[in-house]
């Protein structure tokens, strides 16, 4: 009997070693990238973000409360980030399109010079998919200054101004404050509900595990989603 138990344990150890050495691979074809054939029934709001995690950090409470199509521009090359994003979309009941444009190239943040026009065309296509009730994206400052956030803002704003100014339905993520400044302004900021805050926090840390350090650095903003409506001429 002891010999059988020993052999079972040995087999389990060997199997574990094989799995660790050769982890399961997800085929890129299974990641559902650039799928524009999305069921948009009961979806009349669209959120456009640069990276997976921007959706929850800047608009998680809205995703929890409402039905959104979330468009993520980058990170299709990172299977871990694709799967994290899909898990978050499932957790919030959101529809999604992941466009698969580069976040980093050769270890450096991509400047989007070679894909800027393609991103613009995709955003044009997405905004034409429905008569959207609400469109939201990054603010002019890119929240804390991220260049991809700024470029996403510019692209969405440009497409909107050229085609949809009469809709009056474009919003930008709320103003970012540094952690050492938040106490000075928080009395003037509207907080999301405690229930949504707890759920938002849980989803971010449960699913966006690769971005824990980013989440830690921005967690002081999790309670605030003071989106600003776009005014023509701004």
Placement of each model-derived feature along the sequence:
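Active-site beta-strand->loop->alpha-helix modules in alpha/beta enzyme cores, enriched
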Residues: 2-166
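The feature marks non-catalytic terminal segments
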Residues: 6, 11-14, 166-234
């Amino acid at each position: 009997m002891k010999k059988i138990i020993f052999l079972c344990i040995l087999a389990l150890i060997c199997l574990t070693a094989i799995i660790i050495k050769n982890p399961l691979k997800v085929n890129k074809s299974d990641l559902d990238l650039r799928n524009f054939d999305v069921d948009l029934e009961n979806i009349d709001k669209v959120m456009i973000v640069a990276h997976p995690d921007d959706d929850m950090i800047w608009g998680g409470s809205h995703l929890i409360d409402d039905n959104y199509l979330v468009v993520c521009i980058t990170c299709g090359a990172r299977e871990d980030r694709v799967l994290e994003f899909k898990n978050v979309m499932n957790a919030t009941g959101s529809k999604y399109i992941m466009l698969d444009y580069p976040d980093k190239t050769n270890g450096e943040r991509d400047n989007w010079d070679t894909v800027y026009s393609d991103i613009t065309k995709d955003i044009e296509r997405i905004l034409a998919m429905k008569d959207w009730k609400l469109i939201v994206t990054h603010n002019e400052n890119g929240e804390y200054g991220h260049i991809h956030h700024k470029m996403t803002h510019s692209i969405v704003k440009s497409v909107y101004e050229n085609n949809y100014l009469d809709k009056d339905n474009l919003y930008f993520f709320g103003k970012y404050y540094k952690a050492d400044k938040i106490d000075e302004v928080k009395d003037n900021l509207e907080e999301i509900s405690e229930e949504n805050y707890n759920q938002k926090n849980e989803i971010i840390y449960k699913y966006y595990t690769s971005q824990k350090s980013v989440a830690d650095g921005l967690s002081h903003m999790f309670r605030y989603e003071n989106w600003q409506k776009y005014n023509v001429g701004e």
